[in-house]
């Protein structure tokens, strides 16, 4: 057993644990006011919309303590649901007939009439003979404050991706390994203020895990009762990534408690949750990130030692700068790391107008717009795409469009088209700001951000909820090293030891897996980062399908 200060124990793992001076009960660390948690979408603009790096905030959801914004929905007396019980009949730049039996629904459902809170969603039926026999899975990207429509639906496991070889935002290409092959898929933009979801009440933009979870439970009740009653009794799963490590168990807990407390409400048939590269226990996830950097040779051992000695892992992270020596250690890490793709360390970066000006993966992403650099970037990224397409083909993704490190540019351009918004029943009342992948107006609770959600996972397991925790093994932000630490703290008995698992179509090792009592599984997805379903779609689909069927990932 290894002792972590502040009373945390880490058992049965060989990863060293923090020894920082800041792990002293009651120590207060003064922080620079200008530094906030930064979600990665604006750091290296590629596919995921939900990750953490601890650098100056640029355009993502803020950690609440500042004054409220006035950017709320301005049309209070036009509140109402804009969803339709009819599937989409057309979608610009894409032939819906290519989806086979699958249909897409989209719209907005009100979750609080008094304040005017309404959440936007897309829903993709399973590509099976009878979708009413398939489970329903809700996917949530993290942030906090990032879009599951821009993330999951448009750039990870959804039915299509932006076409990197077409003019920006004009065409989509089919995802052959979309998760709706095996499940009905619901993608929800939450909390209000994210994406096309809105509120008429400024104070709603200050939000945390509890209200987010309550709003999502209300949304689900109305979704199943009003929009898809034919699916109300189906097995229901929740999946997510990054800050989804908070969202998912909080929502699952609200559902379990609601089912027990309100027997006359619709019973949501929650069966399990899955979280990828999940932010769960801040001090362990923070330490795990720094440890990953040094063990993957992107920073030096002396720099790691200095971060470990001088930076506070119990705050928002080793890279939210402290005064003095911690600040110097952060500078050293930035210089050593260079401008790599920090959430997929062996993948190319997006060489756009901002990234071209940066020299470090941890540097401020703010930069003036440069059409020339963007044009250069499009050419360079096509070259990167050809290289990574070959790598994905070798891994079994034969018909996939290839990894595009600038996919979020295409997503934003596409979702801001008026004809696309009309097709999706989105933005019908005219939001006073464009759609963006991560909200700049939501002010998320710092207290919740720094709260461990481990007790919720333990309680869900005790209530018979199946849990899959998975890690893309080359993510350097919420990496496997931190996840292994908090999984060990679950206190569960191991029932099947660590072993490889094989993706059967390609007969290649898809990752590694260990199983615990009470249907708790921890798996890795080999050669993928923070957005495993995009980078390794076939392996991720096999893992997801195995989880839904309550099967086992095996080497056979």
Model-derived features with residue positions:
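Terminal and linker regions of secretory-pathway proteins
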Residues: 3, 7, 30-556
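Short hydrophobic alpha-helical segments enriched in small aliphatic residues
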Residues: 7-13, 24, 29
